[in-house]
């Protein structure tokens, strides 16, 4: 599998679209198609690469990435290179979308933050020649891994716990305890912050 970097995305996928600030519908579809194609056989180098890529994705295009990776029997989370898990049902093996429950939740957490605005309406988000702080605010995402590994206000943790109850997208590991669930279960309400 190939490792995808931010530089690769800027040169190969966005390089030919630097002449104007507004993408046409056709150009936006070309970029989305290139991203899906690229991530079908590769994975993101690090969290920063995935966050950069998220600026260009919508929930629908992200689902295309997950489904394309599932077709190749690769974990649907773009930071992962492992094989998707297998379930045995009536003698048939069904491939899950993810390698484990944690990546399922990481993926859904990311997808819920992606902008619904079509890529061709995101003015200048594809340009690589300058940094626009407005895009960093409008289209930036945080990853679940970052929240788990840092100091988090208790209100954020409580809202995460509440939203996790709705994250039943891939139930391959539904009955398996998740280290994150154990971690959140140990928190008390009188703590102001939690540290991993």
UniProtKB/Swiss-Prot annotation:
Probable RNA polymerase II subunit B1 C-terminal domain (CTD) phosphatase that regulates RNA polymerase II transcription. May have functional redundancy with RTR1. Its EC number is 3.1.3.16. Zn(2+) binds at residues 75, 80, 99, 103. GO terms for cellular component: cytoplasm; nucleus. InterPro entries: Rtr1/RPAP2 (IPR039693), Rtr1/RPAP2_dom (IPR007308), Rtr1/RPAP2_sf (IPR038534). A zinc finger (RTR1-type) spans 52-123. This is RNA polymerase II subunit B1 CTD phosphatase RTR2. It is found in: Cytoplasm; Nucleus. The gene is RTR2. One of its GO terms (molecular function) is RNA polymerase core enzyme binding. Keywords: Cytoplasm, Hydrolase, Metal-binding, Nucleus, Protein phosphatase, Transcription, Transcription regulation, Zinc, Zinc-finger. It catalyses: O-phospho-L-seryl-[protein] + H2O = L-seryl-[protein] + phosphate; O-phospho-L-threonyl-[protein] + H2O = L-threonyl-[protein] + phosphate. It is an enzyme of class 3 (hydrolase). Its main location: cytoplasm. Belongs to the RPAP2 family. Present with 1050 molecules/cell in log phase SD medium. PANTHER family: RNA POLYMERASE II SUBUNIT B1 CTD PHOSPHATASE RPAP2-RELATED (PTHR14732:SF0).
